[in-house]
A protein has these predicted regions:
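Structural alpha/beta core scaffold segments of enzyme domains
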Residues: 1-427
Length: 427
């Protein structure tokens, strides 16, 4: 055995309890991770690492989806960092388990089951490196059989007992405020949910909900203002509007006395939709015991905290479980759809509510990749670069829940008492 205390991975420091990572159920070792499956195969890769670290075959472990109550907080699944961040943590967990449970011989799983779940992984002794058996092999993806065979697996496939369908009617434009209808509006088979300019319907049958939403759209009257920039001249809007200056590197003006030629060019890109292959969805159930949420969020712990902040709840009463949906390359509307489901479920306590976005919802109200404009200039002298500058104008490139202290959930801006934003100073 060896003491690797000085080499404890960061994700172990933040989640030091053994039972947060590993347990045994029905004779199978369960491995909990905070990283989530977005279609990139990451859970299979982490399963390979975990199996080897525990000295078990891949078939001898069961991967458990990320869960705010029963699993580690590993932040966001983003930036191609999952193996880099979660892999060392799983290896450390396995090394502790092997040190405590002994050789992987007869009775090994039973000995793992008998381990103290409160064992501190940051101070426990560790076994030496495990043999690579699964890692390095092309193992079959754990998530693909259900997807290939069309078996229910995605969030939109969930049908818990008593579930209601829900839809949300978005304002026709940014900043629009709802004038009509009032809470007396009715349609067959549905219940109206209104909080300020947040407007939705819930019902037993999806067809009734969709019909009611169409009727509601026709009956609504909004107070609108033109708040969007000229899409044909985004570069000018970006360069002239209020902004923060963030110097990345500033070594002063270059010496141009020996520069013989200067090249300058500007480049721009518009706002871009992430455009997942299917729209986002969320499922929530509001009960006396607390709030349960099922989401395909890339960060279930930040989502839990954002929901609690937006509604004034104790985060300990909010439980978020990851369920796969359409994958994404960039921040899609998973978090916003989950919050929609929460607001709808709040109106019908005890009943689970599935809130599904439409394609128009996703393309008009989902998070967008920021527009950018840049100017690059380079001085040349004697065939060498004598000076170089690069200036970029853009909005921030993250608006995920909890960033800079704001819940960052779309419907929060539409409530009768909008969620306050933290103070920001323009420079």
């Amino acid at each position: 055995m060896s003491d690797l205390r000085a080499q404890v991975p960061a994700h172990i420091e933040g989640n030091p309890r053994l039972g947060t990572w590993v347990g045994v159920r029905d004779g199978v070792v369960e491995v909990h991770v905070g990283k989530v499956e977005l279609g990139q195969g990451i859970v299979t890769a982490l399963a390979q690492i975990a199996a080897d670290a525990l000295a078990l075959p891949l078939s001898g472990i069961r991967m458990v989806a990320a869960h705010t109550t029963h699993g580690p907080d590993e932040g966001l699944t983003a930036g191609s960092l999952s193996v880099l961040q979660a892999g060392p943590a799983l290896r450390h967990v396995g090394a502790v388990v092997r040190a405590l449970a002994g050789p992987s011989e007869e009775g090994y799983v039973a000995r793992i089951a008998a381990l103290d779940p409160d064992t501190d992984l940051t101070t426990a002794a560790t076994a030496g490196p495990a043999a690579a058996v699964s890692v390095g092999r092309s193992e079959a993806r754990l998530d693909l059989p259900d997807k290939v065979l069309g078996r229910p697996r995605y969030l939109a496939d969930l049908r818990p007992e008593g579930m209601l369908h829900g839809r949300v009617l978005r304002p026709p434009s940014v900043g629009a405020r709802l004038v009509e209808p009032d809470e007396a509006w009715k349609a067959p088979g549905v219940e109206l949910v209104r909080d300020g300019s947040f407007l939705g319907v819930v019902g037993e049958r999806e067809v009734d909900v969709d019909r009611a939403l169409d009727q509601l759209r026709r009956d609504c009257r909004w107070d609108e203002r033109d708040l969007l920039p000229d899409e044909d001249d985004l570069p000018a809007w970006l360069r002239t509007g209020p902004h923060e200056e963030i110097p990345v590197l500033d070594e002063g003006a270059p010496d141009v006395s020996w520069t013989t030629r200067t090249l300058t060019a500007s480049y721009s890109k518009p706002f871009l939709a992430h455009a997942s292959i299917a729209p986002s969805a969320g499922l929530a159930q509001w009960t006396e015991e607390g709030l349960r949420v099922w989401s395909h969020s890339q960060g279930i712990h930040p989502l839990r905290d954002a929901i609690a902040q937006a509604l004034g709840l104790d985060p300990a009463t909010v439980e978020v479980e990851h369920v796969e949906n359409a994958g994404c390359y960039g921040h899609n509307a998973a978090d916003d759809a989950a919050f929609d489901a929460v607001l709808l479920a709040r109106a019908v306590p005890g009943r689970p509510v599935l809130a599904r976005w439409t394609r128009p919802d996703e393309l008009t109200w989902g998070p967008l990749s920021s527009a950018m404009t840049a100017t690059v200039s380079a001085g040349l002298a004697g065939g060498r670069i004598s000076g170089w500058s690069y200036d970029v104008w853009s909005q921030g490139h993250t608006s995920r829940p909890g960033f800079r202290g704001a819940p960052g959930l779309l419907a929060g801006a539409h409530l009768a008492a909008p969620v306050p934003l933290p103070d920001r100073k323009n420079t």
